[in-house]
């Protein structure tokens, strides 16, 4: 069997920054460091940080007063920020700057009283944080996931409307939903370029090319990773068998029936270390050649908070 590697794949700038924030906070301040929600959606990464002293919680009520807490890359609502401030928690914010950009769009709509429509997945922490930027009772923010949801929106054609999207959605599904929104609400405003981030876009485009050459596409990523799930879905829609896996232990013998070429990619929160461990396992199943596709070079970089750039000196 032959292995073909997608490019780009794996960590994006926002994930790199978020992990660095937790690592630096542990190095500078020592354990325990509390993290609200999984800092990124990858089991391997989270377990590694937990082993080093990070404590992952879902609510700030689980964090002692005055402790250090890190907000995950997915962002938090204004209510969570206020709660942290009221309880005198020391906060390091690992929210991806591209998520923060969407937060600013929602906050702007809230200040103006413009009704907002967010395209995203209900229950995802990024969506909860983004929805939580809207506080104007004279307007409102409404969540839709697909074209069919548009019919139940309560707004009128002449309402002042704007839309924004979760950053990790399917490019194809989102384009279809935006087109349907504009058809129903011709005057609706939105971002000049959709809010789906560069890493999601690049990895989906890379999988399109990978799937054309593969009998099976393996996506390295955790089940709760939105962008990883979209990669597996995209390959399946192209008629190619696909599997989402956390690590080599997930690999099953029957995946390789009639498979001559295996394509491998990784979600934006999956480290290259996992990709290489899966390649090693595939060699045991008979994979004997590896090819890496050419792809877009990514050079995006996001700084960590200033307080974490220089070690404290006693």
Curated annotation (Swiss-Prot):
Amino acids binding (2E)-4-hydroxy-3-methylbut-2-enyl diphosphate: 41, 74, 124, 167, 225-227, 269
Its EC number(s): 1.17.7.4
Pathway: Isoprenoid biosynthesis; dimethylallyl diphosphate biosynthesis; dimethylallyl diphosphate from (2E)-4-hydroxy-3-methylbutenyl diphosphate: step 1/1; Isoprenoid biosynthesis; isopentenyl diphosphate biosynthesis via DXP pathway; isopentenyl diphosphate from 1-deoxy-D-xylulose 5-phosphate: step 6/6
Catalytic activity: isopentenyl diphosphate + 2 oxidized [2Fe-2S]-[ferredoxin] + H2O = (2E)-4-hydroxy-3-methylbut-2-enyl diphosphate + 2 reduced [2Fe-2S]-[ferredoxin] + 2 H(+); dimethylallyl diphosphate + 2 oxidized [2Fe-2S]-[ferredoxin] + H2O = (2E)-4-hydroxy-3-methylbut-2-enyl diphosphate + 2 reduced [2Fe-2S]-[ferredoxin] + 2 H(+)
Top-rank taxon, per record: Bacteria
Regions that span the bilayer: none
EC main group: oxidoreductase
Residues given in the record as [4Fe-4S] cluster binding sites: 12, 96, 197
Cofactor: [4Fe-4S] cluster
Cross-referenced Gene3D superfamilies: 3.40.50.11270, 4-hydroxy-3-methylbut-2-enyl diphosphate reductase, catalytic domain (3.40.1010.20)
Active-site residue numbers: 126
BP GO annotations: dimethylallyl diphosphate biosynthetic process; isopentenyl diphosphate biosynthetic process, methylerythritol 4-phosphate pathway; terpenoid biosynthetic process
Function: Catalyzes the conversion of 1-hydroxy-2-methyl-2-(E)-butenyl 4-diphosphate (HMBPP) into a mixture of isopentenyl diphosphate (IPP) and dimethylallyl diphosphate (DMAPP). Acts in the terminal step of the DOXP/MEP pathway for isoprenoid precursor biosynthesis.
Family: Belongs to the IspH family.
Official protein name in the record: 4-hydroxy-3-methylbut-2-enyl diphosphate reductase
Taxonomy of the source species: Bacteria, Pseudomonadati, Pseudomonadota, Gammaproteobacteria, Pasteurellales
